[in-house]
Amino acid sequence: MPREQQKRGRRAEKKSQKEDSKRKFEETSEDPVAKRIKPSADDHETNEANDNIQLLENEDYIPLEQGEQQEGEQPDLDGDMPFYGLLDEEESEYFQRANEMLELNQFQDAEERSLFVDSVYSEANGKELKIACSQGCSRLMEKLISMSDARQLRRIFSKFIGHFLHLVQHRFASHCCETLFIHAAPAVMQKTKSQPKRSDEEGEEEPELSLADMFMAVIEELKENWGYLLTERFASHTIRVLLLVLAGEPVDVTSNESFVASRKKERIEIPTIQGEEKAGKSKAEKHTVPETFEPALKKIMTDMVAGLDDVYLRALATHPVGNPVLQVLLFLELSHFGKSSAKDPKSTIRRLVPDESFEEGSESAVFISGLLYDAVGSRLLETMVRYLPGKSFKNLYRNNLGDRIGSLSRNSTAGYVVLRMLERLGKDDLKIAMANINPEVPGLIERSRLIVPKMLIERCMVRGVDTKPLAEALEGAYSKDPAVRLQQMLKFNISENTAPQSEDHDMEEDNDGKDRKPRGPPPVSAAEKAEKLHASLLVQAMLTVPGPMSQLVYTSLLAQSSETIVQLAQEPTSSRVLQQALTSTTSTPQIRRQLTTRFQGYLTPLALSSSGSHVVDALWSATKDIFFVKERMAQELEQHEQELRDSFVGRAVWRNWSMDLFKRRRRDWTHKAKGFEERTEGNEGAERPKSKIEQARARYAAAKEAADAGATGANQTTVASR
C-alpha cells in the first residue's frame, strides 16, 4: 500500500496547521459573540504563577485584571473593530502622489497650495475613514488636517463623529484624531456663521455643529469607556491630547517636556511657504475654551479613576501606558484647577499620597520610594515634585528626599527627580543641597552623569548662591594639568592630523579616480555623542558663572595650542564651548586677546567648515574692542575670497563679516567694526552728533536769548529794534 505523500520542514508543518484551523473555523457555527469559557482551577494556578513571576521582576507593578474592571468599561465592539473598507489601487496611488507633492512643497505661494488641498479634499469626500485607517495614506490625512482652515476642520470633524470610539483605538487613525484635536483647539471659540444650509459644489451640506459642540459630541461618545481607554496602547496618547485641549493648555508634540511627546511618534512637519505665517506658535500657547469644557473635563477626570481602587490606581504609576495619562491628570489637577482640588480627599493626588506629611514609614513615603528608582514611575514623581503645592513639596523634601539628595543624584533614574527638586529649592535649601551633592561630584564626572552638576550651577546662578565649593569639587574631579583637564571635560581626543579639513572636500580619491572613500575620524556611536553633548553643556554652564568656575575653563583653553583649538572648533559639540568663551560676559579683554590670536592663520579652513564657521562668526563680536586683531582677520579672509564664495558656509561668513564693505568702503567698515553703528542704532530717537559749526551756532543762539531775557525797559526796546 503506497504511503501518503508528506512534505517535510517547519514551513510545510505551519501551512498544514493553518489549513486545519481554517477548516475547523468553516465547520463551526457563525455565532456573532463567542462564549466565555469558565477558567479551570489549573488555569487559575498557572495565571497566579505567571503573575508572581512578573511581580518578582517589577515589584511596584500590579497588573490590572480584566475581570475586576468596572462593568461597561470595556467597549462593546462585538468582537472586532469595524472595517471601513480599502482604497482601490487608483485611489491609493492618487493619495500617495498627493502626499509626495505636499512633502516636496514646491508651490509658488500659499494660495496655490490651498487650491491643491481643496482638490484633494474633494477627491477624498466620502473616503475620509478609509484614508485615516490606511497605513500608506493616514499621513496624508494628518497633513491635510494641519493645512486646513476652520471650515475644513469642521467638515472632517463631522465625518469622524460617531466613529471616534473605534478610531482612537486604531493604530493609524488615532494619530489623525490627535492631529485633528490639536489643530481644532485654536478655532474652538469661533462662532459658526448663521447661514442657511447650502450645498457646495460636491453636493455636500455644511455641518451645523460648531467645533465646541463637536468636542462635546466626542466626550459623549467616549464617556462610557474612559477607564478602558486609559490603558489602551493607541488611545491613551489621543486621550492625553483631548484632556489638554479641553483644559485650554498648550499641546506641543515637539517639546521634550510636553506630556504628549513621544520618541516613537513620527513628527509630521508642514514647511511654510511665501505668503504664509508659521502656525507653530499657536499650538505652544494657551487658548481660551468654552465654559462647558471645564465641567466636562472634571467629569472625565473623575470617571477615569472612579472604577479603580487605590491599589490599582497606584499600579498605574508604573504602567507604561497608563503612567503618561496619570501625569496629565495630576498636572491638570494641581496646576489648572488650583490648590483647592489637591485638598479634596477624592482627588487623584490624595488617593495616591493620602498622607501629606510624607514622614518616613507612612503610606505616602513608601509609595514615593517605590517610584524613585523605577524608569516609568520616576516620571510621575517628577510631575508631582514640579506641581505639588508649596507646603506639600516642603514636607516631601524635608521629611523624605532632602537628606538623600546626594545618593539620589548618583542614580541614573532618580537623578531626574533631583533636577526637579533643585528647580524648586530656595536659597538656603539650595546651599544645603549643594553641600550634600559636592562629595558625589567626582563620581558623577567619572560616570558621565553630568545633568545634576549642570542644573546645580544654573540654579545657583538664579538664586545667587556662591559656587566656589562646587568649583573646587569640579576641579578635584579633573586633572591638575590644564591642557589635559579640557580634554577630560569635553571628552575630546587630540588627533595626529592637526590640519583642519573643510567639509566641502571631505572625500579623498584613489589614483584611478574611481573609488572615493570618506576621510576623517571614524564614526561616533550614539552613546559617545550623548556623552560629548552633556559634557559640552556642562562646560558652557560653567562659563556663565563669574569667578573660579569660569576661570577653570578659561585657563584650560589658554593652555591649548593653536592646532588643538582649531580641532575643537571643528567638532560640533566642542565648538559651542568656544563660541560661549568668545562671547560670554565673563571673558575679559585680556582673555579674548590671547584666545583670538590662536585662530590667525586658520580662518579660511574654519570658515569652510559647518561647525568652524560659527566660531569665525563669534570672532566678530569677540574682537569688538580689539580692532587691530579684527582687521588682520578680515585681511586673511580677503586673501581667500574665491574659496569662501564657492562654499555655502563660506558665503555666510563673508556676509557676516561685511567683507564687501571691507573691500569697497574701508572707512565705513571700520566704523561698523568698532561698533559705532550699533551705538547709533541702540539710541533710537536720539539726535545725530552735531558738527562744530552747528555747535557754534547753538552757542550764539543761546547767548542771544540770554541777552534778550536780561534786557529791561528802554534797553529791551533797543534790543528788539536790532
UniProtKB/Swiss-Prot annotation:
Gene3D superfamilies: Leucine-rich Repeat Variant. Residues 1-54, 496-529, 676-722 are annotated as: Disordered. Residues 14-27, 676-697 have a biased composition (Basic and acidic residues). InterPro entries: ARM-like, ARM-type_fold, NOP9, Pumilio_RNA-bd_rpt. Residues 698-714 have a biased composition (Low complexity). GO terms for molecular function: RNA binding. The keyword Nucleotide-binding does not apply. It holds the Pfam family PUF_NOP9. Keywords: Nucleus, Repeat, Ribosome biogenesis, rRNA processing. One of its GO terms (cellular component) is nucleolus. It is found in: Nucleus, Nucleolus. Its main location: nucleus. Pumilio repeats lie at residues 123-158, 363-398, 400-435, 556-597, 598-635. GO terms for biological process: endonucleolytic cleavage in 5'-ETS of tricistronic rRNA transcript (SSU-rRNA, 5.8S rRNA, LSU-rRNA); endonucleolytic cleavage in ITS1 to separate SSU-rRNA from 5.8S rRNA and LSU-rRNA from tricistronic rRNA transcript (SSU-rRNA, 5.8S rRNA, LSU-rRNA); endonucleolytic cleavage to generate mature 5'-end of SSU-rRNA from (SSU-rRNA, 5.8S rRNA, LSU-rRNA); ribosomal small subunit export from nucleus. Transmembrane segments: none annotated. The keyword Membrane does not apply. Belongs to the NOP9 family. RNA-binding nucleolar protein required for pre-rRNA processing. Involved in production of 18S rRNA and assembly of small ribosomal subunit. This is Nucleolar protein 9. It comes from Penicillium rubens (strain ATCC 28089 / DSM 1075 / NRRL 1951 / Wisconsin 54-1255). The lineage of its organism: Eukaryota, Fungi, Dikarya, Ascomycota, Pezizomycotina.
